[in-house]
Swiss-Prot record:
It comes from Arabidopsis thaliana (Mouse-ear cress). Expressed in shoots, stems, leaves, flowers and siliques. This is Protein NRT1/ PTR FAMILY 3.1. One of its GO terms (cellular component) is plasma membrane. Residues 1-16 have a biased composition (Basic and acidic residues). It is found in: Membrane. Disruption phenotype: Slower growth and delayed bolting. Nitrite accumulation in leaves. Pfam families: PTR2. The keyword Transmembrane applies. Disulfide bonds: none annotated. May act as an efflux-type nitrite transporter. Not regulated by the PII protein involved in the regulation of nitrite uptake into higher plant chloroplasts. Keywords: Membrane, Nitrate assimilation, Transmembrane, Transmembrane helix, Transport. PANTHER family: OLIGOPEPTIDE TRANSPORTER-RELATED.
Length: 596
């Protein structure tokens, strides 16, 4: 029955692509995927990294309105990946979702680029000290449509592109599974390299050459990303969508609730198994029964009311297979680990706000004639991240492998844990650097001169920026690996969307934390930890150390979650040259961060 199911899936793939099915995927597809990622990230980051300047200097929007416009866009862009993941996992597949989403994004970028080139689509430039004319309704409509198309495009690209790349390695082939974790490292490396190029070269072009060229280059890069991605079509592994994963999860919950009064069977083998029904959603292996959350197992208890007949597909709202029950268990188990990464994003977010404000008050001259822009300080984070990824992949893994015996060196839970520790050190160091900066300001009588440069080198900030980059190389990639590896096979786009959603929540938590600290640290004399106008009179170091304490508490929470976490147990089917599948049980259920 199981072999027939696999043959059926192969036939579906033949019909889907219109030609005989042959081995696809693997390393040969990586140049297309990485070229797509570099061009796409160069386009997206180059398009938005300096957008606040475009809105204020070209469209003459007030700063608050411009900031709120971009914030609303960012919030929408963080929600649409759930929609894109649903479409990809349910019926469209990842390839077509990425392709059409990229085209939608391309249209939005082209629209805004045209508005930057044609003078009538922008308000007239300001002359001298006169009041600038703000963009009218028609001109703003172009902006809003472009940003909306960008948000919709992001929704299809973000959750699918990284999962699609990982799909190119066959999990049932031991020779390819070891390449999957390597893929995540190099995917993030390509992304970081593109970001580095965007925040330096493209931002400089936008500020010093012109917005037509500054937005035109990212638009062309986006077009090239689509060409590069589509160019590998015949080489890719195209996994057939298996229907809405959300519907299956809800069906398990409803079936378990309906049978909540039943007594649990003593022998798990008496539960409902059906390899033929589960074949489309378990190509990489079947999830086996676990003892945790046994109340959900009641959804797989067969009763007379189910009226189950041989060869008949059951009503899934009343009866679910064990594999589908374990899908829901996997999603629930992932929640606490996934949520633990939110505070790291909160800490990382301070680089673009308060750390940047610190940099503005410090001496940033490399030579008498060249000064590093405060907004380019993130370059040190990106360089540290890229360097760490290379070191991790080429040195760290080989050394760790000798001690752990694991092909990937350490598990993704280990990797996330290391990232948490480094992030704690980064915010701790940031607090001490602020103490040093203010001591120099006091020494030179500059406490009440917020716009005067404090005679202290910006090099003092490099450790905190660099440590955040190292932390991201460990935590963010480990986080992404965790979501992809531990998510049910048919929900990997959705799982990647959850990764982006965690990043979004981390930024929102940062906003909430800043608001609360600003409110409750205010004193009658007007002093505040986070003052509006004079950082020298604030207590920014206290804010950094507050984040340090919160991260330390979060680390304890993470270690507890990792200790009790149960890896999803998969029964993999190897069907190389042998007509009968060889089943290999992956004993992962007792592995944890602490045990390993």
């Amino acid at each position: 029955m199981e072999e027939q199911s696999k043959n059926k899936i192969s036939e579906e793939e033949k019909q889907l692509h219109g030609r005989p099915n042959r081995p696809k995927g693997g390393l040969i597809t990586m140049p297309f995927i990485f070229a797509n990622e570099i061009c796409e990230k160069l386009a997206v980051v180059g398009f938005h990294a300096n957008m606040i300047s475009y809105l204020t200097t070209q469209l003459h929007l007030p700063l608050t309105k411009a900031a709120n416009t971009l914030t609303n866009f960012a919030g929408t862009s963080s929600l649409t990946p759930l929609l894109g993941a649903f479409i990809a996992d349910s019926f469209a597949g990842r390839f077509w979702t990425i392709t059409f989403a990229s085209i939608i994004y391309q249209i939005g970028m082209t629209l805004l680029t045209i508005s930057a080139i044609i003078p009538t689509l922008r308000p007239p430039p300001c002359k001298g000290e006169e009041v600038c004319v703000v963009a009218d309704t028609a001109q703003l409509s172009i902006l809003y449509v472009a940003l909306l198309l960008g948000a919709l495009g992001s929704g299809g690209i973000r959750p699918c592109v990284v999962a699609f790349g990982a799909d190119q390695f066959d999990e049932s082939d031991p020779n390819q599974t070891t390449k999957t974790w390597n893929y995540f490292n190099w995917y993030y490396f390509c992304m970081g390299a593109a970001v580095l190029l965007a925040v330096t070269v493209l931002v400089w072009i936008q500020d010093n050459v012109g917005w037509g060229l500054g937005l035109g280059i990212p638009t062309v890069a986006m077009f090239l990303s689509v060409i590069a991605f589509v160019g590998g079509f015949q080489l890719y592994r195209h996994l057939v969508p298996a229907g809405s994963p959300f519907t299956r999860l809800i069906q398990v919950g409803v079936a378990a609730f309906r049978k909540r009064k039943l007594r649990m069977v003593s022998d798990p083998s008496l539960l409902y198994f059906n390899d033929e029904i589960d074949a489309p959603i378990s190509l990489g292996g079947k999830l086996t029964h676990t003892k945790h959350m046994s109340f959900l197992d009641k959804a797989a208890i067969v009763t007379e009311e189910d009226n189950l007949k041989p060869g008949q597909i059951p009503n899934h709202w009343r009866l679910s297979t064990v594999h589908r029950v374990e899908e829901l268990k996997s999603v629930i188990r992932m929640g606490p680990i996934g949520a633990s990464g939110i505070l790291l994003i909160t800490a990382y977010a301070q680089q673009g706000t308060f750390s940047l404000q610190q940099a503005k008050t410090m001496n940033r001259h490399l030579t008498n004639s060249f000064q590093i822009p405060a907004g380019s300080m993130s370059v040190f984070t990106t360089v540290a991240m890229l360097t760490t990824i290379i070191f991790y992949d080429r040195v760290f893994v080989k050394v760790a492998r000798k001690f752990t015996g694991l092909e990937r060196g350490i598990t993704f839970l280990h990797r996330m844990g290391i990232g948490f520790v480094i992030s704690i050190i980064a915010t701790l160091v940031a607090g001490f650097v602020e103490v040093k900066r203010k001591s120099v300001a006091i020494e030179h009588g500059l406490l009440d001169k917020p716009h005067t440069i404090v005679p202290i080198s910006f090099l003092w900030l490099i450790p905190q920026y660099g440590l955040h980059g190292v932390a991201e190389a460990f935590m963010s990639i480990g986080h992404l690996e965790f979501f992809y590896d531990q998510a049910p096979e048919s929900m990997r786009s959705t799982a990647t969307a959850l990764f982006w959603m965690a990043i979004s929540i981390g930024n929102y938590v940062s906003t909430l934390l800043v608001t609360l600290v600003h409110k409750f640290s205010a004193k009658p004399d007007g002093s505040n930890w986070l003052p509006d106008n004079n950082l020298n009179r604030g207590r920014l170091e206290y804010f950094y150390w507050l984040i340090t304490v919160l991260q330390a508490v979060n680390l304890v929470y993470y270690l507890w979650c990792a200790k009790i976490y149960t890896y999803k147990p998969v029964q993999v089917h190897h069907s190389k040259e042998d007509s009968s599948p060889v089943k290999e049980e992956l004993q992962l259920s007792n592995r944890s961060l602490v045990d390993e």
